[in-house]
């Protein structure tokens, strides 16, 4: 039974792999037997992720996916892969009236356009094996709920959700699946470096029926499931994992 969840023999590209969810996804994919290709902008942190992976044959490609050129160079350097997990992203909280076009460009280039361009280039350059799996890391802020100052961030994640559904239809003839993982708040370095104090964080956790935030490795487990052959009949789906938050 457990073999159906194995990633042995699969090559998986993980973006945003230098920390947080991306690092955890790479670690769990490697633990499940995958050969991982890690990409992000920070080489030192990528090497730290690489050193933490089980198994051999993993590699690193430093790339800035917020630019067209960075995406093209990355895809040109890739072998054919069996899966892509798009984890690259930033979180910024800012009221809409205080934003300008540079804020729009930064968030959309990093959170949405990087993933969209990556999949476009991978398809155009024929870097996806038949029956590959593409997984987008979205957020409940994109489709399920909003928060003050989250208009741009939510818009970027909503864009990924819409892209996933249409692209799933487009790639279905090649048996390539496209799905999203839609988490609530996850404990990552991004959260640790936020301006929210410990008391506020504890109060916010109590709004979750399971009384805690998610862990990055839990997103990693879910990514492994969606990359595995256990989900060969799942595409265009948004898999919600939010500790029950949106039940409220």
Each PLM stretch: what is its role?
Residues 119, 156, 164:
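Active-site helix of classical SDR
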Residues 18-19:
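Conserved glycine-rich cofactor-binding loop
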Residues 212-241, 246-247:
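C-terminal substrate-recognition "lid" of short-chain dehydrogenase/reductases
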Residues 172, 177, 234-236:
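Short, small/polar-rich loop/turn modules that mediate ligand/substrate recognition or access, typified
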Residues 139:
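Residue(s) in the substrate-gating loop at a strand-loop-helix junction
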